[in-house]
Amino acid sequence: MERVYNFSAGPSILPLPVLEKVQKELVNYNGTGMSIMEMSHRSSYFQSIIDEAGSLLRELMNIPDEYEVLFLQGGASLQFSMIPLNLMNTYKKAGYVLTGSWSKKALQEAEKVGEVQVIASSENEKFTTIPKLDGLLGNEKLDYVHITTNNTIEGTKYVDIPHVDKVPLVADMSSNILSERYDVSKFGLIYAGAQKNLGPAGLTIAIIKRDLIGGADRYCPTMLNYETYSKNNSLYNTPPSFSIYVTKIVLEWLKEQGGVSAIEEQNKMKSSLLYNFLDESKLFTSPVDPTYRSLMNIPFTTPSEELNNEFLQKAKERGLVTLKGHRSVGGMRASIYNAMPAHGVQQLVNYMKEFELENR
């Protein structure tokens, strides 16, 4: 069977050259006579893999020396707890900006650790936009401020990163890390689950300023303390070694594409193909405020559930799969991460045009 175009929000499409290299090295990695999946994480071979992955990420994101790159487990969802356990250490209070389902879940976990202030929210607009933060961060005594740079479910993203004076800015970048350029120095902590733009599920990346490490309460569990990973080069216990290995190959592929600046231009072009059609369509609509449209996750719908279901079924027959929208939003959603080729997006648009002609 030929490969399909997979528009899944995560786990998501991986670059075909990456999969082919993994396939080639799967049984016998680098002449060792064993697979990465069988290899000791204490071996020199794996040490070089995790070191190279960290170096590549630093290079691609231009990460300053005062930041640590940590390879973690538990998904971004575990970070919802780790962050307050490690950073709510002075005022026992944090600020959260609500822009979607995931930021709301992050807030709910933080409330179990300390006091949470909702700085701004677009919930009244059904999370179809990004709220303004002007003047809301005056002299607040907060341990950190948390944002979600791209909202996977709702299809919105920050156009400008808010300036937070004297308070660490924490960002969930799970669905748009490495898809566009960010100034890492604006953040105290960046975290992301790997399974959208970095690699396979099982790995979480944290990029954290060194002066934010070491402040966890003494009752903080060892495995939830950033210091544990910092002191042990992310090798305190067995890491998700295969996921780290595949992520390294994805980062190599990304570098070959010209790095983040080149991939950002590709992503703008790909998303424009779909948005331009949606703006002209008489059948399909996008619920998102055009100012804050995501480059990665694009929700859209037709006037009826029946048409939505028909669209999804016929799309699947054409090899355009996993287009069903999240249950909280409905309709359809095309996730067009870094690895999605422009041809895949064009195939989707061509099909949407045909479907509209059939259902005028």
From Swiss-Prot:
PROSITE patterns: AA_TRANSFER_CLASS_5 (PS00595). This is Phosphoserine aminotransferase. Binds 1 pyridoxal phosphate per subunit. HAMAP family: SerC_aminotrans_5 (MF_00160). Its main location: cytoplasm. L-glutamate binds at residue 42. Homodimer. Belongs to the class-V pyridoxal-phosphate-dependent aminotransferase family. SerC subfamily. One of its GO terms (biological process) is L-serine biosynthetic process. It comes from Bacillus thuringiensis subsp. konkukian (strain 97-27). The lineage of its organism: Bacteria, Bacillati, Bacillota, Bacilli, Bacillales. Pathway: Amino-acid biosynthesis; L-serine biosynthesis; L-serine from 3-phospho-D-glycerate: step 2/3.
